[in-house]
Amino acid sequence: MKKTVLSGVQATGSLHLGNYLGAIKNWVKMQEEYNCFFFLADLHAITVDIKPSELNNSIMEVLAVYLAAGLNPDKVTIFAQSMVKEHTELAWLLNCVTPLGWLKRMTQFKDKAGSDQEKACLGLFSYPVLMAADILIYKADIVPVGEDQKQHLELTRDIAGVINRKFNKEILKVPEVLISETGTRIMSLRDGLKKMSKSDISDFSRINLKDDNDLIHQKIKKAKTDHLSFVSYDQETRPEISNLLDIYSSLSEESLEQIIGNYQNQGFAKFKEDLAEIIITNLQPIRDKYLELMNDKEYLLKILHKGAEKARIRASETVNEVKEQFGFVI
């Protein structure tokens, strides 16, 4: 029997190169080997202020990128989180056994809430519990995530343990965390210490998957490096050039040593020019397919409804199992 893999991307804003290299590119490889559930995290998206029209468009955009990048809806289950009501039902049950102190230790809440945490919504605070429900409801064996989500996955494992100990029975599977070595943490093109993000004010901090070729060339040309005139890799002392090397390696599948050797006696200009071309070679087919899919909303909706119907079968089984243990009438 194939192991179950689950992962998702938040449906806010345009997806970028970091989303592709950190998640979607790896998912495409995994779909042949695993029973995969890939969702659009639209419930998580409303933990921050977002316009209804923007949310609706983002859901379609993320789905179109999933498909354009190579996810096959005949091989994997693709769905919007909000279309499977069991996610929120299980999240409530998990909320009722999760100690408040565990959530207070979550660093992402502090980062996203900013300086005035009293004004942050409860949904943002309990975000990790909904994330735990997203994972545990499908009894996922493996959850591929970026390094920044590792703390949330540890919480998920802890919550599963609480439920299993409470009822002295292995009801929820404790998932394994999968963090791949390359591409999981692509940094900003303007600051090598910050993760590439949809929320960054500067559009030149990221390569959006729908950027045209000229804009990609401009962004890479203006990408921050440092005062040294040679290519080398050191994340601590040279974070910006190291980030560009990570991108190059992830897309070309050449080792860092090979790439550095190729540009040993050349400056940044040639390296950046070649990097831009490699990015374009990888992203142009995705962008072309994405634009085609965005013109067929009826097809996209069909994929979402089909995926949600399939996901609900698995999700409802888990929720009923947990509810029965709590003592609810099923």
From Swiss-Prot:
InterPro entries to which the protein is assigned, alphabetical: aa-tRNA-synth_Ic, Rossmann-like_a/b/a_fold, Trp-tRNA-ligase, Trp-tRNA-ligase_bac-type, Trp-tRNA_synthetase
CDD domains in UniProt: TrpRS_core
Enzyme class: ligase
Compartments it resides in: Cytoplasm
Catalytic activity reported: tRNA(Trp) + L-tryptophan + ATP = L-tryptophyl-tRNA(Trp) + AMP + diphosphate + H(+)
Binding site for ATP: 10-12, 18-19, 146-148, 186, 195-199
Cellular component aspect of the GO annotation: cytoplasm
Alphabetical keyword list: Aminoacyl-tRNA synthetase, ATP-binding, Cytoplasm, Ligase, Nucleotide-binding, Protein biosynthesis
EC number: 6.1.1.2
GO molecular function, one term: ATP binding
Motif mapping: 'HIGH' region: 11-19
Gene3D superfamilies: HUPs (3.40.50.620), Tyrosyl-Transfer RNA Synthetase (1.10.240.10)
Gene Ontology terms describing biological process: tryptophanyl-tRNA aminoacylation
Keyword match Protein biosynthesis: yes
Binding site for L-tryptophan: 134
One Pfam family per UniProt: tRNA-synt_1b
Xref: HAMAP family: Trp_tRNA_synth_B
Family designation: Belongs to the class-I aminoacyl-tRNA synthetase family.
NCBIfam families documented for this protein: trpS
Function field: Catalyzes the attachment of tryptophan to tRNA(Trp).
Subunit structure of this chain's protein: Homodimer.
Name of the protein: Tryptophan--tRNA ligase
Organism: Rickettsia conorii (strain ATCC VR-613 / Malish 7)
